[in-house]
Amino acid sequence: MQQDGLGVGTRNGSGKGRSVHPSWPWCAPRPLRYFGRDARARRAQTAAMALLAGGLSRGLGSHPAAAGRDAVVFVWLLLSTWCTAPARAIQVTVSNPYHVVILFQPVTLPCTYQMTSTPTQPIVIWKYKSFCRDRIADAFSPASVDNQLNAQLAAGNPGYNPYVECQDSVRTVRVVATKQGNAVTLGDYYQGRRITITGNADLTFDQTAWGDSGVYYCSVVSAQDLQGNNEAYAELIVLGRTSGVAELLPGFQAGPIEDWLFVVVVCLAAFLIFLLLGICWCQCCPHTCCCYVRCPCCPDKCCCPEALYAAGKAATSGVPSIYAPSTYAHLSPAKTPPPPAMIPMGPAYNGYPGGYPGDVDRSSSAGGQGSYVPLLRDTDSSVASEVRSGYRIQASQQDDSMRVLYYMEKELANFDPSRPGPPSGRVERAMSEVTSLHEDDWRSRPSRGPALTPIRDEEWGGHSPRSPRGWDQEPAREQAGGGWRARRPRARSVDALDDLTPPSTAESGSRSPTSNGGRSRAYMPPRSRSRDDLYDQDDSRDFPRSRDPHYDDFRSRERPPADPRSHHHRTRDPRDNGSRSGDLPYDGRLLEEAVRKKGSEERRRPHKEEEEEAYYPPAPPPYSETDSQASRERRLKKNLALSRESLVV
């Protein structure tokens, strides 16, 4: 190492000397003058000179032998002062003081140091200090006022660096790593980073990160080397990677893309993914999920049909239904609703081609022959359009039970439990007797039969119920109060007429066949089953009877009932008509006519039964719920086209 002055007795430092003992350099060359850098040598020299001055003062005034000893001591002290231990120096250098790297790229900051001797390993310390000024900002604004001021300061002082030379209190200072021997210790801020000190004193970053830009100082500390320059610095700037193309996928490069376009592309991709999930959900949606959860791609549909689901819930929970109360729930006798309109289970319908109406399936039969199930059209009900065709049971042309199930499903689809009310529309009026197959016995339910119509008298028997003449317009006919009629009570039913038969009518009953004007026994009037038949018999003058007894029966049923609110009440009960002052006298001719007809009916019964067998079809086979259930299960297993909604029914 170079020193200020080397050699003894020289000023230019060119002379050199060696110590006497080879292992201890106690007589190393020392400078003539000290410039304040070695304080220990200066203090030793001052003490030696003080002792020398004291010895000389004593020796001059003492014995000559003592003076010789003092001279030896003086020489020894002088030589010991000149031959003290040498002062070593250290020098630290950085080969490249300026580094610019890309983010996440490795970088190494080289640092080397030199010493006169290395009896012990020195301590290497790397420190981080932020820039006093931002180099990146100044590079993008070279015409700023601060840049102009820095340029003026650099021109006046060539060694001035405005980005490095500032107080540590105004910038960030951190210890990066330290090394002593082979042990490397990272600072608290850099724990977990791949940073190490390699070689002599090189600082190595495996990956740079944001915030690594700054000034890094390399310091070497040794207990033996007290002179020289033990510190140097290097600047590091970390830049982000910028290129003219954007690499979206590995090996795929695209041109520069705007930020707003990138956001739009991301939103569209998210929407497409959501739509794809919705479509897959609709395709794979189970039929047992909640009906109120709808798919986003098909909002008009849900996982299962709502109408069918609600009807099934009503059937299983026992809630009364306005469509078929006896089918969906078992009602108590107190809440028994009026019987719905039924389709008669009789012979073929007249007036239609083939004997069937337009809304009846000819090949379907739920209870055997004579039981026809109507098929609903889409135009029959206003709510039929709401039923989705995707959830209907596809009726099979070969299987009659599928038609029945289709009809029942159509009824359930039109069922709305949230709006109870009186039944309306063809769906309610088309109720057939299929709904009563599973009902309990009618004998176990308290019910009241229809009220019988009062018996008409002979005076107004010639007028039909459609006649405008009322009871008040009929003239009162007074009858004589004698005979057996005056002593007999009024008959309240047809069956009570047997007890009121007079002696004269018993014989007339046997002669009734001859009194009918030659009418054959096959076309005798049938036995009266109700009082409506008596009206038809009395109205024979207005409506002549045909030879077909069934036509007469249907004609009596097609006659509209009398309006109870009109003033034409045909009742003979004085309690029902308060305007009459008293009861009219009873006419016995009606009684005689009824008894005569009853006797002829008893004799004509065998012939009538033979005629009825010729008109009516044979009775259907007895219904068995077990057989029907077993056959229904077999048909369901064979039909693979049934949807899962049919199981709810």
Curated annotation (Swiss-Prot):
Pfam families: LSR. It is a single-pass type I membrane protein. Disulfide bonds join C111-C218. The chain crosses the membrane at residues 260-280. Residues 1-21, 414-649 are annotated as: Disordered. Changing E235G: Found in a patient with familial intrahepatic cholestasis; uncertain significance. One of its GO terms (cellular component) is very-low-density lipoprotein particle. It is found in: Cell membrane; Cell junction, Tight junction. The modification Phosphoserine is found at residues 365, 371, 389, 432, 436, 464, 467, 493, 528, 530, 540, 579, 631, 643, 646. Residues 426-444, 529-565, 589-609 have a biased composition (Basic and acidic residues). There is a cross-link at K638 (Glycyl lysine isopeptide (Lys-Gly) (interchain with G-Cter in ubiquitin)). Its main location: membrane. The modification Phosphotyrosine is found at Y535. The modification Phosphothreonine is found at T336, T453, T501. Phosphorylation at Ser-365 by MAPK8/JNK1 and MAPK9/JNK2 may be required for exclusive localization at tricellular tight junstions. The keyword Transmembrane applies. It is linked to Defects in LSR may be the cause of familial intrahepatic cholestasis. PANTHER family: LIPOLYSIS-STIMULATED LIPOPROTEIN RECEPTOR, TRANSMEMBRANE AND IMMUNOGLOBULIN DOMAIN-CONTAINING PROTEIN. This is Lipolysis-stimulated lipoprotein receptor. It comes from Homo sapiens (Human).
